[in-house]
């Protein structure tokens, strides 16, 4: 009889920060790594150690122990320490598509510094669910096996019959297939990643240990190769493991115990995997469970962190990188070093215990600083890049006209219309001329001569303007000391159209020119209207929205809901028998606060009395560590005013209504959502996830017991009956639910307050109550068809990205007054990134196909390139793509494909 093999893999799962602040864990990491190196030095029987799939552990260790790099590198090159493939162990759903890619890229790049011995295992040990496109991302990274701890329901061959092939497997080994058809071997930690920890050396204890652990592993294993993970969260090195393995071999001669690693384990596993392995498909979010321990509500814990993260990602991916790639074509060096620093600083906030908001308060305070550091670096890149581009634009067409030109950049990746604002300096006087107080006084006497905006063809454009007074500014020359000044300024607002993707248009403010402004967008009492939409704000502050292109009207949009929450940072739980409160029927204060031909805003104020907190029972249950889903606490009978200020904005020509919410939160232990009844009959909906629009069921599986069915989203969630649709776009609001009512109501979480971490102990988190002023931004987009067919996804994506509008000198230059550096089109195709590849120096653009059928992507350049090639997400050359003129290329994207195009300039 062939012996079973027990593969014992030593590891530790290293949460950089969690129930203790980062530096507490950091000190423990130094101790662990010192012990590991000492063990490797002194015990040749201690074969290897898996460093949790994340290279940042090396960075953190060497920050304090730089003298150990040589020894560390030696053991990595010898294969005794296994590193990578990631930089950090991210939460997949709360970080962007590109962030997941950059995590892989940086992990590989950093691993090469230690000899390039990278562990080619897609390692997701503790992710709170797994992204559907992971197999495609892994395959494009040269990885064909994934190891994960959550998302699939293990049934066990001798336990029960699988009922859902998509999300269940009788074995811990399976095939995992992404929407494009990419397939990897999936290995589930069916007995978690600690089923081989603390192996006893004492013989009687060892017998009892292995008599339990071996059958538990056999229950789910499809082969005779059994996986035992020798470690757990922050688990110290088991320094006597060699001896423990020798004891096990003596006691269990029918089992071959080996101190293994993932490479060896997977190699042996491949040889014996049965042909009838279950295939699981797409997202693995524990769909076939009772719904209580999915940890999905980390998406709404400390919403402010998610908003800061979304803003940082957008600035990096959709502003800084495309503009820097464009500027590189114009001769400016691409700042790889600054981008790596900005990305790494941002990614240090991406581990699941960090970005999920499920740690102690000290952790999340430090995260805010990291977000600000990354953002400031990114904004520096943007400013330097835009200044470089501005200096090369030929604006001489505006010479001799007393013109003040300005350039409108579009880095969204889609052709763009919209309303923009810019403050223009009509004149400057530097401090070297006189005291700034004198300069300001003199300049205030200069009147602003009325004017208008003109384009390069001399057409006068409708605009509005206001005197912006005298403003302070400064130059930072590259060759001299700072130059402060005062400037006489005017603020201009106008509608721009057809700003090309990856391009710009240059317009100019010209004094003396004029054009009659268009009609107001306020067309009735508390009514906003443009040529596409009509929005009426009702007495309770909700919105009645009519799409003029279809004639369809949605009523009752943006009612607010407040529910008690006796859960924790991980999970929302409404008190038993409790019902949510809503603002439906609650009279609101309404007023028009902005009324112009380009933008109109109605402000709504609710003074809403809600419970001040949960009752005293909750704190008692927290201290007694009562599991959240059996708690008895209720909401307090004491009320406090929760003031919400809502600003509905409609721009000229807009396809959406923008909503800005300010909440003064004085209440604890609750959740606030905005409700959007779609009114469409459908059993499913679409939500943007990692490189896909994931189609999800409105009603959960029969095993689901949790009254809530909250889900993750990225930039939008959408309901459609096939003919019409309603999409809600958001900025950093990652939690939603399509309610199980007869209206398929989209509920988007704006705020959640909780007072404890949860999980395995009592860790108070008073700052997670989010007391104080908080904001939220989202947009309501009605459309024909679904969000992909209609192209509404592009509107949702553009909603994320700020306009970049800057004043430029009248000058001669290399580039025309209006220009596009790259143009593309593709129905159902979404833009992801445009950047310069670190290794090749080539430009790489990335797109993905939202459709589950083939889509055509067409890309063109204004000037010929040296060549085009298909790349992967690692930005490696895969195959050349033919082009008849080296300016244009057409590519057929397969269903749900992530496609990277390399451009050799």
Predicted regions located by residue number:
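Core alpha/beta catalytic barrel or barrel-like domain that forms the active/cofactor pocket
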Residues: 7-10, 48-53, 77-93, 114-126, ...
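N-terminal catalytic cores of secreted or lumenal carbohydrate-active enzymes
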Residues: 1-98, 102-103, 110-114, 140, ...
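C-terminal (or distal) subdomains of carbohydrate-active enzymes
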Residues: 134-139, 145-151, 172, 188, ...
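Surface-exposed loop and adjacent secondary-structure segments within mature catalytic domains
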Residues: 70-80, 131-197
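CE4/NodB-like, metal-dependent polysaccharide N-deacetylase domain
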Residues: 101-140, 212-227
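The substrate-binding groove and active-site-proximal loops of carbohydrate-active enzymes
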Residues: 15-28, 52-61, 85-100, 117-128, ...
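Catalytic grooves of carbohydrate-active enzymes
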Residues: 8-9, 13-19, 24, 179-394, ...
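Conserved short loop/turn motifs at secondary-structure junctions
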Residues: 53-58, 89-92, 120-129, 152, ...
């Amino acid at each position: 009889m062939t012996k079973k093999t027990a593969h014992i893999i030593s590891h530790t799962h290293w949460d950089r920060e969690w129930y203790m602040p980062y530096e507490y864990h950091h000190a423990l990491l130094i101790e662990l790594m010192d012990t590991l190196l000492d063990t490797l030095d002194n015990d040749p029987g201690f074969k290897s150690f898996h460093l949790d799939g994340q290279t940042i552990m090396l960075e953190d260790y060497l920050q304090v122990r730089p003298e150990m790099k040589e020894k560390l590198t030696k053991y990595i090159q010898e294969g005794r320490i296994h590193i990578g493939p990631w930089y950090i162990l991210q939460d997949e759903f709360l970080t962007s598509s590109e962030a997941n890619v950059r995590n892989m890229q940086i992990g590989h790049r950093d691993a090469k510094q230690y000899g390039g011995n990278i562990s080619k295992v897609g390692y997701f040990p503790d992710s709170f669910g797994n992204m559907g496109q992971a197999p495609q991302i892994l395959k494009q990274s040269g990885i064909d096996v994934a190891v994960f701890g959550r998302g699939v329901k293990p049934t066990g061959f001798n336990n029960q019959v699988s009922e859902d092939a998509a999300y269940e497997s009788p074995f811990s080994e399976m095939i995992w297939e992404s929407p494009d058809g990419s397939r990897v071997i999936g290995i589930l930690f069916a007995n978690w990643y600690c089923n081989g920890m603390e192996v006893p050396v004492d013989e009687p204890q060892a017998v009892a240990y292995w008599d339990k652990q071996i059958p538990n592993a056999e229950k789910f294993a499809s082969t005779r190769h059994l996986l035992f993970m020798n470690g757990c969260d922050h688990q110290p090195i088991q320094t006597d493991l060699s001896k423990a393995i020798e004891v096990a071999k003596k006691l269990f001669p029918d089992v071959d115990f080996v101190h293994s690693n993932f490479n060896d384990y997977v190699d042996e596993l491949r040889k014996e995997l049965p042909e009838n392995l279950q295939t699981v498909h797409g997202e693995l979010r524990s769909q076939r469970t009772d719904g209580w321990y999915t940890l999905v509500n980390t998406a709404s814990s400390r919403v402010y962190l998610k908003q800061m993260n979304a803003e940082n990602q957008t600035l990096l991916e959709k502003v800084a990188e495309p503009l820097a790639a464009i500027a590189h074509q114009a001769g400016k060096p691409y700042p790889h070093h600054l981008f790596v620093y900005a990305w790494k600083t941002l990614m240090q906030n991406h581990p699941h215990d960090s970005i999920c908001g499920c740690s102690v308060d000290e952790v999340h305070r430090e995260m805010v600083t990291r977000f600000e550091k990354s953002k400031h670096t990114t904004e520096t890149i943007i400013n330097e890049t835009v200044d470089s581009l501005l200096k090369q634009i030929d604006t001489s067409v505006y010479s001799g006209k007393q013109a003040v030109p300005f350039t409108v950049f579009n880095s969204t990746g889609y052709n763009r219309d919209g309303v923009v604002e810019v403050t223009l300096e009509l004149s400057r006087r530097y401090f070297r001329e006189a005291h700034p107080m004198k300069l300001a006084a003199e300049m205030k006497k200069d009147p602003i001569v009325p004017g208008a905006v003109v384009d390069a063809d001399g057409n006068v454009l409708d605009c509005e303007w206001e005197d912006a007074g005298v403003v302070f500014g400064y130059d930072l020359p590259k060759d001299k000391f700072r130059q402060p000044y005062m400037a006489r300024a005017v603020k201009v607002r106008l509608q721009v159209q057809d700003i090309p993707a990856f391009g710009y248009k240059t317009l100019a403010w010209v004094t003396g020119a004029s054009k009659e402004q268009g009609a107001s967008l306020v067309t009735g009492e508390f009514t906003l209207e443009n040529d596409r939409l009509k929005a009426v704000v009702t007495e309770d502050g909700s919105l009645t929205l009519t799409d003029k292109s279809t004639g369809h009207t949605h009523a009752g949009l943006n009612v607010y809901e407040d529910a008690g929450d006796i859960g924790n940072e991980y999970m929302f739980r409404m008190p038993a028998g409790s019902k949510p409160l809503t603002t439906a029927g609650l009279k609101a204060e309404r007023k028009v606060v902005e009324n112009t031909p380009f933008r109109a805003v109605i402000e709504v104020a609710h003074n809403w009395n809600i419970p001040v907190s949960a009752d005293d029972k909750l704190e008692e249950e927290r201290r007694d560590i009562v599991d959240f889903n059996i708690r008895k606490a209720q909401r307090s009978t004491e009320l406090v005013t929760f003031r919400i200020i809502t600003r509905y904005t409609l721009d000229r020509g807009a396809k959406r209504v923008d909503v800005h919410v300010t909440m003064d939160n004085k209440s604890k232990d609750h959740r606030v959502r905005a409700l959007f009844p779609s009114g469409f009959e459908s059993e499913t909906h679409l939500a943007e996830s990692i490189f896909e629009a994931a189609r999800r069921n409105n009603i959960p599986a029969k095993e689901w017991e949790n009254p809530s069915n909250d889900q993750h989203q990225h930039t939008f969630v959408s309901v459609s009956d096939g003919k019409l649709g309603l999409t809600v776009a958001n900025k950093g609001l990652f939690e939603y639910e399509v309610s199980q009512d007869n209206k398929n109501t989209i509920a988007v979480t704006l705020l959640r307050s909780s007072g404890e971490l949860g999980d395995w102990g009592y860790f108070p988190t008073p700052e997670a109550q989010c007391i104080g002023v908080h904001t939220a931004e989202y947009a309501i987009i009605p459309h024909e068809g679904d969000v992909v067919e209609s192209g509404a996804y592009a509107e949702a994506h553009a909603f994320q990205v700020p306009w970049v509008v800057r004043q430029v000198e009248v000058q001669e230059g290399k580039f025309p007054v209006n220009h596009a550096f790259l143009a593309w089109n593709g129905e159902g195709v979404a833009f992801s990134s445009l950047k310069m590849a670190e290794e090749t120096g080539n430009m790489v653009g990335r797109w993905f196909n939202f459709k589950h059928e083939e889509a055509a992507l067409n890309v063109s350049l204004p000037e010929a390139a040296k060549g085009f090639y298909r790349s992967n997400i690692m930005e490696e050359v895969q195959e050349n793509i033919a082009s008849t003129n080296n300016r244009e290329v057409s590519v057929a994207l397969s269903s749900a494909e992530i496609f990277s195009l390399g451009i050799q300039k």
